[in-house]
C-alpha cells in the first residue's frame, strides 16, 4: 500500500504540473491573434533570458540561479542512488544462474503489466531485476545532473541582465526533486525502509557494535552488466544526447568568453546548431527519451516526466527561434526551432 501511495503521489504531482504549466503552453501555442494577450501572460511566467518579456522583470531573479537546480539535483540524486545501490547489493543480489536476461526483460517490458504498480505477480528474480534497473536509471541521471552542475559554474557565463521568473525558479526546483524520484518511485518505499532499518540499527547498537558493511566492487557492478537490451539501447541514446548537449553548451559558453561580449548575443554555429536553433534542448529531449527506453517504457510516471520535458522545451525552443529571427536579419534560413526538418 505504501508503494502505491508513493507512486500515485509522484504521478499526481506530475499531472498537476501538466495542468498548471503545460496546458497553458499548449493553448498559448495555438496560432490565433485572439490569444495574443494570453500568450504574453504565459511568456511572462515561462520565459527566461532573452525570451523573457521586457515588461515581466517584476518577480524575477538572476538566471545564474540555475545552478541551484543542479546543486539540488546532484545532492538528491546521489542520495537516491547510494541508498538504492546499497539496497540492491544487500537485498537484491543477482546470480548468473538465476538471472535469465531475455525472459525477465521481455516480461517486464511486455504488455500484461504495462503501467502496473503492483509487484505481487512478480517473481523474486524479476523484482531484483527491477531494483537494478532503477540503479541504472539513477546512475544515468547522476551523470546528467553532475555535468549540468559543472557547466553552471565553469561553462555558462550569463548576461548580467538575464533573468527568469520566480515561478520558473520554483518549477525548476520541483523538477530536479521529482525527476530522480520518478525513476525509482516504484521501489522507493522498500529502499526507504531498508535505510531506516540501517539507521535504527546503528543508533541502537552504536558504532562499535555495528558490523561494517562488506563491499565487493565486482558484485556491486556486475549486475548492471546483466541488464537487458532495452537498458543498453536506452543508455546509448542517453549518452548520444548527453554528448551533443555537452558540445552545444560548450559552443554557447564560448560565445561569452570575452568580457566585452557579456551583453551581446551572437548566432551560434557548430554541432547540431547547423540544423536547429536550440540543439541543447533537442539533446535534453533525446537523453530523457533514452531514460524512458531504458526504463522499459511501461511506467506511466516516467512517461509523464518525459512528456513534461518534451513539451516544455519545445515551447521554449519555438520562442527562442522566433527571437533569433527577429534579432538577426542574416539568421540561417535552413534552421528549424528544435526538431530537424519538422519544427
From Swiss-Prot:
Question: Is Aminoacyl-tRNA synthetase tagged as a keyword?
Answer: no
Look up and give the membrane topology term: Multi-pass membrane protein
Transmembrane ranges? 12-32, 66-86, 164-184, 223-243, 266-286, 291-311
Give its localization.
Endoplasmic reticulum membrane
> Which pathway is this protein engaged in?
Protein modification; protein glycosylation
What is the name attached to this protein's record?
Polyprenal reductase 2
Q: Name one Pfam family in it.
A: Steroid_dh
Q: Name one GO biological process term.
A: protein N-linked glycosylation
* PANTHER family, A to Z: DFG10 PROTEIN, POLYPRENOL REDUCTASE
Name the source's superkingdom.
Eukaryota
Instruction: List keywords of the entry alphabetically.
Output: Endoplasmic reticulum, Membrane, NADP, Oxidoreductase, Transmembrane, Transmembrane helix
Q: What happens when the gene is disrupted?
A: Male sterility, when homozygous. Deformed and non-viable pollen grains.
Name any GO cellular component annotation.
Answer: endoplasmic reticulum membrane
Similarity field: Belongs to the steroid 5-alpha reductase family. Polyprenal reductase subfamily.
